[in-house]
A protein has these predicted regions:
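Short, Lys/Arg-enriched, Trp-marked, Pro/Gly-tolerant hinge/linker segments that flank
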Residues: 2-46, 50-51, 60, 78, ...
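Histidine kinase transmitter module recognition
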Residues: 2, 48-50, 64, 99, ...
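Terminal helix-turn-helix DNA-binding modules in bacterial transcription factors
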Residues: 41-60, 74-119, 139-140
């Protein structure tokens, strides 16, 4: 029994050495802290996706990720190619467009459902994002 445990331990160490040799040569750093940060960022992103109408703030998102505001902004931008606020805005507007087209909601109702308190602000953001007004979705 002890021989099997020793063999298993040696195999695990050998595999670890191979992984470090392969990835280390390519400049890939195996960093458990970075993995934890990535998991936390994914969790925060999933929470935003799950509750688009919630009035998320950068401070709250950073706190949920266990990062400072500045560090959260930098790491989110690096991980996803856009700021958390830009990401949230785009997801809200995409969801609103789906509500307008598929559920035939009014512009005001769609705006409220995705977290916009003021339909005029929603309409402006929608127009900037898509290049046409939200009311155009109701005509299609």
């Amino acid at each position: 029994m002890a021989g099997n445990a020793t063999q298993l331990l040696l195999s695990a160490h050998a595999a670890e050495i191979v992984v470090h040799a392969l990835f280390g040569e390519r400049g890939i750093v195996l960093d458990p802290a970075a993995d934890l940060q990535r998991v936390r960022l994914q969790s925060v992103k999933a929470r935003m996706d799950a509750d688009l109408a919630y009035p998320w703030s950068i401070d709250e998102l950073a706190r949920n990720a266990g990062l400072s505001r500045r560090s959260f902004n930098q790491k989110f931008q690096m991980a996803y190619g856009e700021s958390a606020i830009d990401y949230l805005r785009a997801r809200r507007l995409d969801a609103a467009r789906d509500l307008l087209i598929h559920q035939r909601l009014s512009v005001t109702e769609a705006a409220f459902r995705v977290g916009y308190a003021h339909p005029a602000n929603f309409a402006t953001a929608f127009r900037r994002h898509f290049g046409y007004s939200p009311s155009r979705c109701q005509r299609t």
